[in-house]
A protein has these predicted regions:
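Short loop/turn motifs at secondary-structure junctions and domain boundaries
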Residues: 40-44, 91, 156-158
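Short, glycine/acidic-enriched loop or turn micro-motifs at the edges of active sites
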Residues: 43, 86-88, 182
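Divalent-metal coordination cores built from histidine and acidic residues
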Residues: 2-23, 96-190
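Histidine-rich, glycine-flanked metal-binding segment
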Residues: 6-79
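Hydrophobic alpha-helical segments
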Residues: 48, 54, 85, 92, ...
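Short glycine-rich, polar/acidic loop-and-turn segments at beta strand-coil junctions
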Residues: 37, 55-57, 86-88, 114-116, ...
Length: 190
């Protein structure tokens, strides 16, 4: 039986309460990186402290207790890199191989516009990319191709408009609409 709306709300509320309690130190975090040297990329400073994680989120830095603790004395911790605009399929490797190449260099999140694969395969290409990037150790987010083909002069294997991509908007890793490549059409009000 599917979970009720009230059940979903209650589950989300309990998760948020757990995050707040761990952040405030009222209950142990799920994981604490003890004595980690943190690189503050905004202030250009190094600080040694505990880093608390609850429900998959960093909830605090300071002095924390955790259900699981890892001694990070002498270890450096820094934020992962985010590539805000790529066309993953243009790398000419599978999503799994792409992740093997970028993760060791610190990229933990990418936002991809699957425009090229949509040009060839239409919505099947978008669906493939969503499935092929599921459960990878890099967070792969999507912006939906805004116009396939890119311009009326292009020939492609598919034609996508807002009706074709509408069903993807409910996917949790779809963030919005990608770049408008048909600038001539935009200028002319097409």
């Amino acid at each position: 039986m599917p979970e009720s709306y009230a059940g979903k709300i209650n589950r989300k509320l309990l998760k948020k309460q757990r995050i707040i309690a761990a952040a405030a130190g009222r209950e142990p975090a799920d994981l604490v990186l003890k004595n980690a040297t943190f690189v503050n990329v905004f202030s250009n400073e190094l600080s040694t402290m505990d880093i608390a994680v609850a429900e998959g989120l960093i909830v605090g830095m300071g002095s924390y207790q955790g259900r699981s603790e890892v001694d990070c004395t002498g270890k450096i911790v820094l934020p992962g890199f985010l590539d805000a605009h790529i066309h993953l399929e243009s790398s000419l490797v599978s999503p799994t191989e792409f992740v093997k190449a970028v993760l060791p260099h610190g990229t933990t999140t990418v936002v991809t516009d699957p425009h090229e694969i949509a040009n060839v395969m239409g919505t099947d290409g978008i669906e493939y990319m969503l499935q092929a990037t599921e459960d990878l150790p890099v967070d792969v987010r999507f912006m939906l191709p805004s116009c396939v083909p890119a311009t009326p002069l292009d020939e492609s294997g598919a034609i996508l408009d807002y009706r074709a991509i509408d069903s993807f908007y409910d996917h949790p890793r779809v963030q919005g609409l990608a770049e408008m490549m048909n600038f001539v059409g935009a200028i002319n009000g097409d």
